[in-house]
A protein has these predicted regions:
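N-terminal accessory interaction module
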Residues: 1-16, 191-192
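C-terminal active-site "lid" helix and adjoining low-complexity regulatory extension at the edge
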Residues: 275-316, 324-368
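Short, flexible/disordered intra-domain loops and linkers
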Residues: 31-43, 343-349
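Conserved N-proximal alpha/beta basic substrate-recognition cap immediately N-terminal to
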Residues: 39-153
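Phosphate-binding site of ATP-dependent enzymes
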Residues: 159-164, 176, 183-273
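Rossmann-like NAD(P)H-binding beta-loop-alpha module
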Residues: 140-179
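Glycine-rich phosphate/pyrophosphate-binding beta-alpha loops
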Residues: 175, 258-266, 336-348
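A short glycine-rich, hydrophobically flanked beta-strand micro-motif that places a catalytic Asp/Glu
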Residues: 63-67, 221-225, 237-238, 311-327
Length: 368
């Protein structure tokens, strides 16, 4: 870890003539704490420290912030085992790592000419599964059939068309609020997390699920269930990380698979899942020859999605989630503009690149 004196010198000597540029990582502090010691940003403390260290090594002034005061902001930089509070000018580029940056703060920075690592149009697509579906369905990609719920939704039609379907929030994340309905020998079952129950009245049950989801989320989707290939009794998917580098060029940083806890609907790492190399899973399940074809298709699909998003608005990074069915067909499930890095701990080189590229691209934006 670079010493505090290095950060201090950068802050004191910051000026345009020295070609120093500032990058702000936006994330609200853990306000349950009454001081600046220890972890301030929950699971992201170590991530932020790596970003700041990489930025300093490239000559950038990097800090974490969440509060604005006119043309200044209250920032934090690592000091010892905690964080040191500083007052500094607003950054030239912002990397948002908070789940929800208030629109008034984003607007205030935007009017001052601040660049954003990931732009609003791409974030809006990632945060809304219905919007995402409508963007990508116009392109040659495999997508599960998706429909927005309304009071006139034809439950009979969907139950006749699919033996598996999901009821989920439009704007959910980390596997929250996802219910699956599956028909087994002409009997419907509803599953949420670890609990599966027989359904006597499908229409009534779906309506109650919709009411439950709407207590916490906005709109609700009905989505076709993919007959996924299971890996050791677990649902698995593929997370691809696409990022721009220090020259603003798109690169496929890497991809790995998330394997869910046996018996659960999702593969999310936050609900008991674990990471494994996609190549190992695919080879074990499909054999060496088909593995090569599937891996190549994963790459092609990821680049196709990247070009579509870039045509809407150039972005810094996106996580792409793909599912493989029992026939080896690959489906796009969702995209994420705040992808985690924990999945890439199993491959150190990929993890290192995944941590360094955001700050490098922020530097590119700050200087452009």
């Amino acid at each position: 870890m670079i010493s505090y004196s290095v950060w201090r010198d950068l802050f004191e000597n910051f000026d345009e003539e020295n070609k120093k540029y500032s990058i702000g990582i936006f994330c609200k502090k853990n306000y349950d704490k009454d001081d600046d010691s220890g972890k301030q940003y929950c699971e992201q403390d170590s991530f932020f420290q790596v970003l700041i260290e990489r930025g300093v090594s490239l000559g950038y002034k990097v800090f974490v912030f969440s509060e604005l005061e006119g043309d200044k902001c209250v920032g934090y930089i690592p000091e010892g085992e905690g964080w040191k509070k500083i007052n500094t000018d607003i950054p030239q580029c912002v990397y948002v790592r908070d789940p929800a940056m208030p629109s008034e703060k984003r607007d205030a920075l935007f009017v001052k000419g601040v660049k954003f690592f990931n732009p609003d149009p791409v974030i809006d697509i990632a945060n809304n599964k219905w919007k995402m579906y409508n963007v990508f369905k116009e392109h040659p990609l495999n997508l599960p059939f998706t429909q927005l719920w309304d009071k006139n939704f034809d439950i009979k039609k969907i139950s006749e068309k699919f033996d598996i379907f999901y009821v989920k929030p439009v704007n959910g994340s980390m596997g929250q609020g996802i219910y699956s309905f599956k028909k087994k020998e002409d009997v419907w079952y509803c599953k949420y997390e670890d609990t599966e129950e027989k359904v006597d009245d499908l229409s009534d049950r779906i309506n109650k699920v919709v009411e439950t989801i709407r207590e916490k989320f906005d709109d609700v989707l009905i989505q076709e269930g993919i007959d996924v290939q299971m890996y050791k009794e677990s649902v698995f998917d593929v997370r691809v990380l696409m990022q721009k580098d220090k020259n603003g060029k798109n690169l496929l940083t890497g991809f790995n698979s998330r394997c869910g806890e046996p018996g659960k609907n999702t593969s999310n790492l936050h609900t008991g899942g674990y990471g494994k190399k996609t190549s190992e899973i695919v080879e074990e399940m499909y054999g060496e020859e088909k593995k090569s074809l599937i891996i190549e298709e994963i790459r092609e699909i990821s680049w196709k999605i990247t070009h579509i998003l870039d045509s809407i608005s150039p972005f810094g990074e996106v996580g792409i989630d793909l599912l493989i069915d029992k026939k080896g067909k690959i489906y796009l499930i969702e995209i994420n503009t705040r992808p985690g890095r924990s999945l890439f701990k199993i491959e150190k080189d990929i993890r290192k690149r995944s941590l360094e590229r955001p700050i490098e691209y922020c530097g590119f934006l700050a200087k452009s």
